[in-house]
Amino acid sequence: MDKNFYKNSLNIFNSNFSMKANLSEKDKFYADFWEKNQIYQQILRKRRGNPRFILHDGPPYANGDIHIGHALNKILKDIIVRYKTMAGFYSPFVPGWDTHGLPIENKIINQIGSKSTLEIRRKSNDFANSQILAQMKQFKKLNLLTDFKQIYQTNTPNYEAKQLKLFKKMVSRGLVYRALKPVYWSPSSQSALAEAEIEYLEYRSPSLFTSFDIKKGNNFVAENDKLIIWTTTPWTLIANSGVAVGENFDYVRIKNGENFYVLAANLLEKLAVIFDWKHYEIIDNFPGKSILGIKYLHPIFEKICPIVSGNHVSLDVGSGLVHLAPLFGEDDYWIGRENNLEMVMHVNDDGKFNENAGQFSGQFYADSNKLITEFLEKKSKILHLSFIDHSFPHDWRTLKPVIYRGTPQWFVSIEKIKKDLEKAIEEIEFPENWLKKRLTKMVVERKDWLISRQRSWGIPLIIFYDQNKEPVLDKPEIFDYIISLVEKFGSRIWYEKTTDELLPEKYQNLGWTKENDILDVWFDSGVSFFAANISDEKPPFDIYFEGSDQYRGWFNSSLINSVIYFGFSPYKKLLSHGFVVDAKGNKMSKSRGNGVDPLVILSKYGCDIFRLWVANSEYYNDIVYSEAIFEQNVEIYRKIRNTVRFLITNLADFKPKKYELTEVDLYIFNKIQKLKNEIIQNYDQNRFVRVVKIINNFIIEFSNFYLSIVKDILYADKEESLKRRQVQYNLYELLQVLNIAIAPIMPTTAEEIYSFIQKNNKQISVHMEEFFKKSHFDEELDAKWDEFFQIKDSVYQLIEQKIKSKEIKRPNEVGVLLKTDSDFIKSIDLEKLLMVAKVEFSNEKTEILQLNWEKCPRCWNHFEKINKVCARCFEVLNEIVPEKNS
């Protein structure tokens, strides 16, 4: 008989499930399929009566194309939502967008110039809405399980009105107050900033040691003695109105040359080196409290200022004497208030000096450092000047340096709700305890929250001032009236109407004015738990999941707002992920030149491989993107796909039915149950990288052992043989498990696989299926097979030696004489399991037998020749062409 006869007699089937994925085409095909059949809506209807699981989407900013960080975040969330949905939960996912803020406002101002506030707001609103549509189109390419017709955005009248209801609640609880205090001020944005809007970048500052002359001494210091002062902000010396000492620190009066200096005793040796003092003399030693009240001459202007006590004085750096400019530092401010120091503001909103700066008027603050240093040099007041590179606060939007600057601002008191916040944090589940500490530090250690901004595009602070310029905070009916207008017309009404038109009739024509500031944009997004309609679900929601920078942002503002409004956290569990970095560990962004467009990646690899990269990343750290890492995930995908293709192809003639299994089939079936349990456990823990690794490792082990031994059965046994059906039963079980297991991560591939699976009660989509449940795993059965694998390893060491010495070409040529006393080992089909021609048992030693048997032309196994083919193939062929095989 010719070779084709033998080949055609084998159980070899073809499959339309191709090795090549063509994911880009299939992404579009299945996205259309899901939308046409309203799969998401069907899932929600099917699950509506089930337990709830809500992952609340933190709103990205509606400006520009989505970046790789956006894609990472949305995919991570989608994996959770898909898993929870398949696990039986009602889990609607409502995407949101944050729409107000400086980037959009600046973009509009650059386009149209300095127009009216109304025009800026109208254009900004239109632009934000257009950006939502653009980003929505891009997010759709990520195959998210959601309905983009059901979204929330922070610029709708209903959302804005709810936000102002929460603000009213803050006012009614006495948490909102106005004060002149130093706050982060961005000259580039010309607005106050909260801590959450600060980014620390490297910056070069002068390190200046100068001296202030004492005007009148006492028993410890004398007139014209020089106080040594250290500063990195010479521009603030204009606003100096005091010097702080540590009351209980030791200070010295020393003589160097013709001059007498005062400084902290502990810093003398260090400063003597810096100043190159080689022959100084200590004249006196005294505690800081001994010179409290001593007056000195201002370093620039002809005025006299006092020495006061300061708890913030440190002996780590400087001289132990701290220059105070009360409107340019928080500690300075409180010390200034306690000691009635002069509050000098010499910097305008744009960072330029006003008339209070005298001869330096009109200078930009940063440029004045050089001029002020030169001025002091001429007066022989500089002891040392150098420059330091250090981490310095910058505006997170413009990336320009910010300053502390005292301006009248609106605040929410955190001090008053500190205990409530601490209690709420105790109820939150964190994956790691240090994350709990991080949130606590970010929220609870704040004294207050700066909520006012001096911009146009945002939600107005709906506060009125009476005829005496005092804010009116005790009239709830006024707030209710404004909120009703905003709910009807949107927040633009505040700018379209006059003050009297915005007030209830009884408060009109009293000479009142309205506030011009807007609310912090973190206030906007931070009310989404209340203002957004999440399918009519109410907080607390199950999970908030954003980038790690949101501990100071959305996590922070949401927690504060919810505790104020509801008395509890808006989230039960908090998850965060790192930033996407390049192969060198640098954060990826367009500005750095190392940014990568997620849409380009999707076009090249397809959505499922992009999603696999996300799932296969340890997201709790920074996530590395590189071509090499993506190619690794391509290989993992290929391995999964090829395994699935093998399963589908070899199940072509299988009708789902339960079979009694042989020992090895039972062992593999048991392993599949363990696989299921581990997948469930890691999905429950949101450890997707472990899910991918568990699946990948299982496939490798499954292919190396089980598929190696059963291919012979699948291809060469009778089509209806019990052994073959037993193997197919395991293949079918694994195919179903893999199909469900990868569905949350690779929805397109899972849907394609599902179309090839035969089963009863089949759904229209795999994503409407239920996730498999935990199964019994027999540890005793699993452990029993350890003995076999030890024997297999020892046998194959001997076989490899034979192959290496070229005595044989492959294992199935040999026999094995096996030494064992194990009843279990003797009971299993060792010839199949070891893939050798013959196994016999020995009481002496294990050895390899060279048989010189014939190779079966049909199955290629080696056999002791009786017929043209081996006994098994003889039996199979005899049913096809009787008596022609002998």
From Swiss-Prot:
Binds 1 zinc ion per subunit. It holds the Pfam family Anticodon_1. GO terms for molecular function: aminoacyl-tRNA deacylase activity; ATP binding; isoleucine-tRNA ligase activity; tRNA binding; zinc ion binding. InterPro entries: aa-tRNA-synth_I_CS, aa-tRNA-synth_Ia, Anticodon_Ile_BEm, Ile-tRNA-ligase, Ile-tRNA-ligase_type1, Ile-tRNA_ligase, M/V/L/I-tRNA-synth_anticd-bd, Rossmann-like_a/b/a_fold. It is found in: Cytoplasm. Its main location: cytoplasm. Catalyzes the attachment of isoleucine to tRNA(Ile). As IleRS can inadvertently accommodate and process structurally similar amino acids such as valine, to avoid such errors it has two additional distinct tRNA(Ile)-dependent editing activities. One activity is designated as 'pretransfer' editing and involves the hydrolysis of activated Val-AMP. The other activity is designated 'posttransfer' editing and involves deacylation of mischarged Val-tRNA(Ile). A motif ('HIGH' region) lies at residues 60-70. Its EC number is 6.1.1.5. The gene is ileS. This is Isoleucine--tRNA ligase. Signal peptide: none annotated. One of its GO terms (biological process) is isoleucyl-tRNA aminoacylation. It catalyses: tRNA(Ile) + L-isoleucine + ATP = L-isoleucyl-tRNA(Ile) + AMP + diphosphate. A motif ('KMSKS' region) lies at residues 587-591. It comes from Mesomycoplasma hyopneumoniae (strain 232). Its cofactor is Zn(2+). ATP binds at residue 590. Belongs to the class-I aminoacyl-tRNA synthetase family. IleS type 1 subfamily. Disulfide bonds: none annotated. Zn(2+) binds at residues 856, 859, 870, 873. Keywords: Aminoacyl-tRNA synthetase, ATP-binding, Cytoplasm, Ligase, Metal-binding, Nucleotide-binding, Protein biosynthesis, Zinc. Monomer. It comes from the Bacteria. L-isoleucyl-5'-AMP binds at residue 546.
